[in-house]
């Protein structure tokens, strides 16, 4: 290695410098040999600071870059980048490569000129001297090329300092870097010249604000994001990215002169990658030519590797690996593509620093376009030998790490399956979650059907090899036409196919971390469909994650048709890190009945797919994987539900040897999935057709029936001090209590010195601006970014969705796009809401007509006209609907009305009092964007959940304090009016009532789509409660005047009470004691009642001194029943087992719903539109939370981090009941649903 300190070359004048460049190589590059720079040369100077980006430098000439030839402006940054477009303000570049924009990076690092000692200069220069100087540098690097530039961009970083960060050391102080980048362009090509003078690089790493650690600089080029509908990284090239290679920049060269590096960056030859110069650094004075031995010495000395693909007649240079037989990498997630085979030329040869010097980065020449085209990905061993000593964390917690001669490998322990990096319990059901987006042309249509952010959920019964996949919110225009594409979910079946002896399914091979690209050709139909799927392993919830993209054209299948696919087999061909398969299959389309006949047609389509993954090649002793395996799909079921817009695929899969026909009936049942083991058990094959069933880890039983082991109950102290144990199916989870965090030893320690950081609160996150995205705090120091409704992206970069491009409005309406929203307005001469427009003037509503009739104004009511004394005039809202509360201004009486203006019985109140009326008309949503209804998962801890029209928001609690700055939306369904809320602490699911549809729905706190469980035979469902022990829900219906019960999935409904009720609203349960409580705010006879949960022993608890009792809550710890009254403006409590009531607080404004937690009551108030905390012990309001959007608040409940202790007679085995098990004090009652037709149901006590 040359020593820079040993350079003793004399200084030369500029003229002699040019002569030396032409005659032969020089020594180390002196600063005087840089291109002239500074204000005297006409340079612009970048503003001093950190992370500064220059204004656009408009170019006179055009710059070529990769396959682009239209770049007319560039941007210069403090951090050693020349950008082809303006860098996003939210993107942090140092320590990450490639960035999202086109970039030339002579020294990408976190650089700082805040102190004013360093400077960044830049200009475009057309002077003959500079143009000739650039031409000579290029000529040195590419002697076979005749290049005469017409424009030169010169950028100089002079004496720039590193951003030190909090970990800066005194040894780094005073160190400065000077380097230069020159972009020379002609009409046909562009070149980059990087110049690193002697002693110009004094530091090689900088502090990363993102990773909070020292990271090496990067030298490279990036095309940036490419693609129209779906963005992905384009081609990029890295030439240095560790300390040793960065140090070599001033000592080495690819253009024959130390410190000089030349690259061809824009020409027909660079469409797939930047081309490095290939001129040896001459180490001898006589300038003699060298043989290959010397070439090997020099390139090895410089840290360069020839990665060009040799032709059969051209062997790789000695000392370098054949690119078609490269070692495999162990570090996950980094890929390099095979270069296209063909005869190499000097123009296509690429150089890169040796792979073993880059343990944390991608191999250097990456061609994403070729990955997408061929799907072939090879893994490179990018690091020196790695051992388990410092890489154990790369293995699953259920795996062991083993060292081998060339590296380490992970292997799952007994009773677990996977590839070692990812392991799951054998026989345990698996869940797969992900997103799907598509751009699909149906039939001959020229307009694509576009959908984004669509949920995919899959459930896998592993020991039977059955996979059930559902894709939600698929438009009907494309839903039926996607029915033949069962392999969208079939890849999940391959992952968990039943394994025959000696054969491996996809998860055993890949661990659920791979990329799949498939191409579907429909014979006899033009066009094709491309399917891309990325599996990203197991997330923190134990679920596999997948992203799916669909693009292309499919044949049209008639609405209402069904598709039948016969069982089939598919051969999978295996080689290192690559799996391929192709097949030709049939599917039959059966059209809907027409005149008693159902026409059917059989079609043929071809599938070709490539799966790329990373494997561990260090374990030579492991059994070799068969080169070909056969996937047998024994049953295929496909369905499109147009009402729910859900696409479903179900397949049964096994993997084994190549054979003809269906699986042998004499095979072991474990291999073909015909055993009778529990879904939480593993099937163990024995001799012949014998087998045994063994419950999976975390379950107990005989294998035929397995029960979850409650590890938390069996060993309550297993999580240690300051921790809470949460039981989960098959496992458990320990969570540190507030104020503690896990130490390296897995115990909870006080977080005094390492408090978690809420980056959302501090603003130190990388989410897009608040106008486009929200930062969602997930607990600890973690957060996630989510684009706001009306924007799309990953949350870090969100772009406005132009809804008007998708023809959202009626053809006779104007569409106005706005950031995050859009508006539809009927054209003149048409009436409607913009989504439906009809000729004519806008018709008046019933309320408007009645109001005008009473006022005697046929042409419209005069707002200034006085109302006749004693006359009732209805009040209409801004949309023409009846205001839910109507009042007679002469008498002072008020009452509730339905949507048709009819008075609701029992709602009339005397002067000075207004009844708590609910609007059954959902607010219009056409003024905003289509809001996705996906649930935003809740972080750990206890939360208040409250409803605000169609939105449910969460408000974290720390002990009894509301953490108001962390309030976020949990769920938003714009078309609904959510009234009541209840929380199931067992499954972590929130239930609600909706009076606009009307319906009852639910959603999991872990995320996913909300579902409706009841939508039939409802009037105005309001209050809702549940029995988390007996697994039932209860609700009140103020229109049908009844109280009902059902199972938690909405089945087995039974009416408990339908008499003696006028306006039932609040309802709560005491599952441990078997009691039910509810309010009835009938103005003539308001009351609070109770009964056993089976409907027996009904009685009145409170009747006197009540006004409008709304909300109701029961505290299981203190056995107190509390309520809020909007008529008396009080909060009161009582113990149902004891006489007497206690006034907690008077002077409440207009309380609606209430819940309790610890010593506090929390209630929603209609007048202040707020959530108020009230201390029961001192009878005082302690805090108030005002949501960002000031609209009416409805139900409120508490989402507990764990269930309260207790049980009832329905807790175990449904109390021995065949259907509804309803607890009573000290017992239970078995009840049948109201509709028992054809149901074998037994009622008993």
UniProtKB/Swiss-Prot annotation:
Q: Please list the residue ranges covered by the LDL-receptor class B repeats.
A: 988-1030, 1031-1073, 1074-1118, 1119-1160
Could you cite one Gene Ontology molecular function of this protein? collagen binding
Q: What is its main location?
A: secreted
Task: Specify the NIDO domain's residue ranges.
Answer: 106-268
Q: Which residues form the signal peptide?
A: 1-28
Domain (EGF-like) spans 384-424, 666-707, 708-749, 756-799, 800-838, 1206-1242
GO annotation, cellular component aspect? basement membrane; cell periphery; collagen-containing extracellular matrix; extracellular matrix; extracellular region; protein complex involved in cell-matrix adhesion
Q: A single Pfam family, by name?
A: Ldl_recept_b
The reply on keyword Calcium is: yes
What pairs make up the disulfide bonds?
A: 388-401, 395-410, 409-616, 412-423, 670-683, 677-693, 695-706, 712-725, 719-734, 736-748, 760-775, 767-785, 787-798, 804-815, 809-824, 826-837, 847-876, 887-894, 896-917, 1210-1221, 1217-1230, 1232-1241
Q: Where in the cell is it found?
A: Secreted, Extracellular space, Extracellular matrix, Basement membrane
Q: Where is this site: Involved in perlecan binding?
A: 457, 459, 648
Post-translational events: N- and O-glycosylated.
* Superkingdom in the source lineage: Eukaryota
Which Gene3D superfamilies does the record cross-reference, listed alphabetically?
Answer: Green fluorescent protein (2.40.155.10), Laminin (2.10.25.10), Thyroglobulin type-1 (4.10.800.10), TolB, C-terminal domain (2.120.10.30)
User: How would you summarize the oligomeric state and partners of this protein?
Assistant: Interacts with FBLN1. Interacts with LGALS3BP. Interacts with PLXDC1. Interacts with SVEP1.
Q: Which PANTHER family does this entry report, sorted A to Z? A: NIDOGEN-1, VITELLOGENIN RECEPTOR-LIKE PROTEIN-RELATED-RELATED
Q: What is this protein called?
A: Nidogen-1
Can you name the source organism?
A: Mus musculus
Question: Lineage from the top down?
Answer: Eukaryota, Metazoa, Chordata, Craniata, Vertebrata
């Amino acid at each position: 290695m040359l020593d820079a300190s040993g350079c003793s070359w004399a200084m030369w004048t500029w003229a002699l410098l040019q002569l030396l460049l032409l005659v032969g190589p020089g020594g180390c590059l002196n600063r005087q040999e840089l291109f002239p720079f500074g204000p005297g040369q006409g340079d612009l100077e970048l503003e001093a600071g950190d992370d500064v980006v220059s204004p656009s430098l408009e170019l006179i000439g055009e710059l070529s870059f990769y396959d682009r030839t239209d770049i007319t402006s560039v941007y210069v940054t403090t951090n050693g980048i020349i950008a082809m477009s303006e860098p996003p303000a939210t993107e942090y570049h140092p320590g990450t490569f490639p960035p999202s924009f086109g970039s030339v990076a002579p020294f990408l690092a976190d650089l700082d000129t805040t102190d004013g000692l360093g400077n960044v200069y830049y200009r475009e220069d057309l002077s003959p001297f500079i143009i000739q100087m650039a031409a000579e540098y290029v000529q040195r690097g590419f002697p076979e090329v005749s290049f005469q530039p017409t424009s030169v961009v010169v950028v100089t970083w002079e004496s720039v300092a590193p951003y030190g960060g909090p970990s800066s050391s005194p040894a780094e102080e005073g160190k400065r870097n000077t380097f230069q980048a020159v972009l020379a362009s002609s009409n046909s090509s562009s070149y980059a010249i990087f110049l690193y003078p002697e002693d110009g690089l004094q530091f090689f790493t900088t502090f990363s604000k993102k990773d909070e650690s020292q990271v090496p600089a990067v030298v490279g080029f990036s095309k940036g994001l490419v693609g129209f509908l779906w963005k992905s990284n384009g081609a990029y090239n890295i030439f240095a990215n560790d300390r040793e290679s960065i140090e070599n920049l001033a000592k080495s060269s690819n253009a024959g002169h130390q410190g000089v590096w030349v690259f061809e960056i824009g020409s027909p030859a660079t469409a797939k990658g930047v081309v490095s110069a290939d001129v040896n650094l001459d180490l001898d004075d006589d300038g003699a030519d060298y043989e290959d031995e010397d070439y090997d010495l020099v390139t090895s000395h410089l840290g360069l590797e020839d990665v060009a693909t040799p032709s059969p007649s051209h062997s790789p240079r000695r000392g370098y690996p054949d690119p078609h037989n490269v070692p495999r990498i162990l570090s996950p997630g980094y890929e390099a593509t095979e270069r296209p085979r063909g005869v190499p030329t000097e123009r296509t040869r690429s150089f890169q620093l040796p792979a073993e010097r880059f343990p944390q980065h991608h191999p250097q020449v990456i061609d994403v376009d070729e990955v997408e085209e061929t799907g072939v990905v090879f893994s490179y061993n990018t690091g020196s030998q790695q051992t388990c000593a410092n890489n154990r964390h790369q293995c699953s917690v259920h795996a062991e790490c083993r060292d081998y001669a060339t590296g380490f490998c992970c292997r799952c322990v007994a009773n677990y399956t996977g590839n070692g990096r990812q392991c799951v319990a054998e026989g345990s059901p698996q869940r797969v979650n992900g997103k799907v987006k598509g751009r699909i042309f149906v039939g001959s249509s020229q307009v694509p059907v576009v959908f984004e952010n669509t949920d995919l959920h899959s459930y896998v019964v592993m020991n039977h090899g059955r996979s059930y996949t559902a894709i939600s919110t698929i438009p009907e225009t494309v839903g039926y036409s996607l029915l033949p594409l069962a392999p969208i979910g079939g890849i999940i079946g391959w992952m968990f196919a039943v394994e025959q002896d000696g054969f491996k399914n996809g998860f055993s091979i890949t661990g659920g971390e791979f990329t799949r690209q498939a191409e579907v050709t429909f014979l006899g139909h033009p066009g094709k469909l491309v399917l891309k799927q990325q599996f990203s392993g197991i997330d923190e919830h134990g679920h596999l994650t997948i992203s799916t993209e669909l693009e292309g054209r499919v044949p049209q299948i008639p609405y209402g048709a069904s598709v039948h696919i016969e069982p089939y087999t598919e051969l999978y061909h295996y080689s290192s890190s690559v799996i391929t398969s192709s097949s030709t299959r049939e599917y039959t389309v059966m059209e809907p009945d027409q005149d008693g006949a159902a026409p059917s047609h059989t079609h043929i389509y071809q599938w070709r797919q490539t799966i790329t993954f990373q494997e561990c090649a260090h374990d030579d002793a492991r059994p070799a994987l068969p080169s070909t395996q056969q996937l047998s799909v024994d049953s295929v079921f496909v369905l499109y539900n147009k009402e729910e817009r859900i696409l479903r695929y179900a397949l049964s899969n096994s993997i084994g040897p190549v054979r003809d026909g269906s699986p042998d009936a004499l095979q072991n049942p474990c291999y073909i999935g015909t055993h009778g083991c529990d879904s939480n058990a593993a099937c163990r094959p024995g001799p012949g057709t014998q087998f045994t069933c063994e419950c999976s880890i975390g379950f107990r039983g005989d294998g035929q029936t397995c029960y979850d082991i409650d590890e938390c109950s069996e060993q309550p102290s297993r999580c240690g001090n300051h921790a809470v144990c949460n039981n989960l199916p098959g496992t458990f989870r320990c969570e540190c209590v507030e104020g503690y965090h896990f130490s390296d030893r897995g115990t909870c320690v006080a977080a005094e010195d390492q408090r978690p950081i809420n980056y959302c609160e501090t603003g130190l996150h990388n989410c897009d601006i608040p106008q486009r995205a929200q930062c969602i705090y997930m607990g600890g120091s973690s957060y996630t970014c989510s684009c706001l409704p009306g924007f799309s992206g990953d949350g870090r970069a969100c772009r406005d969705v132009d809804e008007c491009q998708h023809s959202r409005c009626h053809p006779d309406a104007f569409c106005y796009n706005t950031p995050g929203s859009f508006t539809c307005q009927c054209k003149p001469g048409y009436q409607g809401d913009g989504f439906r427009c009809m000729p004519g003037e806008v018709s008046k509503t019933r309320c408007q007509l009645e109001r005008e009739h009473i006022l005697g104004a046929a042409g419209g009511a005069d707002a200034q006209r006085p109302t006749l004394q004693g006359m009732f005039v209805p009040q209409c809202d801004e949309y023409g609907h009846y205001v839910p509360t109507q009042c007679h201004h002469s008498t002072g009486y008020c009452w509730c009305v339905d949507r048709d203006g009819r008075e609701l019985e029992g709602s009339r109140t005397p002067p000075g009092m207004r009844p708590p009326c609910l609007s059954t008309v959902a607010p219009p949503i056409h003024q905003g964007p289509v809001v996705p209804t996906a649930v935003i998962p809740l972080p750990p801890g206890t939360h208040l959940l409250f409803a605000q029209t169609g939105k449910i928001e969460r408000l974290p609690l720390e002990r009894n304090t509301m953490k108001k700055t962390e309030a976020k939306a949990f769920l938003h369904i714009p078309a609904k009016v959510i009234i009541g809320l209840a929380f199931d602490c067992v499954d972590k699911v929130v239930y609600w009532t909706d009076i606009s549809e009307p319906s009852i729905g639910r959603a999991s706190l872990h995320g996913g789509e909300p579902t409706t469980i009841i939508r039939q035979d409802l009037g105005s469902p309001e209050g809702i409660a549940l029995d988390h022990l007996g697994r039932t829900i209860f609700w009140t219906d103020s229109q049908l005047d009844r109280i009902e019960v059902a199972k938690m999935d909405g089945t087995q409904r039974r009416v408990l009470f339908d008499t003696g009720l006028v306006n039932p609203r609040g309802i709560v349960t005491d599952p441990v004691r078997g009691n039910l409580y509810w309010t009835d705010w009938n103005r003539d006879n308001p009351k609070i009642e109770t009964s056993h949960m089976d409907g027996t022993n009904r009685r009145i608890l409170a009747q006197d001194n009540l006004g409008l009792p709304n909300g109701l809550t029961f505290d299981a710890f203190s056995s107190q029943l509390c309520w809020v009254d909007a008529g008396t403006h009080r909060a009161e409590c009582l113990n149902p087992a004891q006489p007497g009531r206690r006034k907690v607080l008077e002077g409440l404004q207009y309380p609606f719903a209430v819940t309790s937690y610890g010593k506090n009551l929390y209630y929603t108030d209609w007048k202040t539109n707020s959530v108020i905390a009230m201390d029961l012990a001192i009878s005082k309001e302690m805090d108030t939370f005002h949501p960002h959007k000031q609209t009416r608040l409805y139900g409120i409940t508490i989402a507990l981090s764990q269930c309260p202790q207790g049980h009832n007679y329905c807790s175990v085995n449904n109390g021995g009941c065949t259907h509804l098990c309803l607890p009573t004090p000290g017992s239970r009652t078995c009840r049948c649903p109201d509709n028992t037709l054809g149901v074998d149901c037994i009622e008993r006590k």
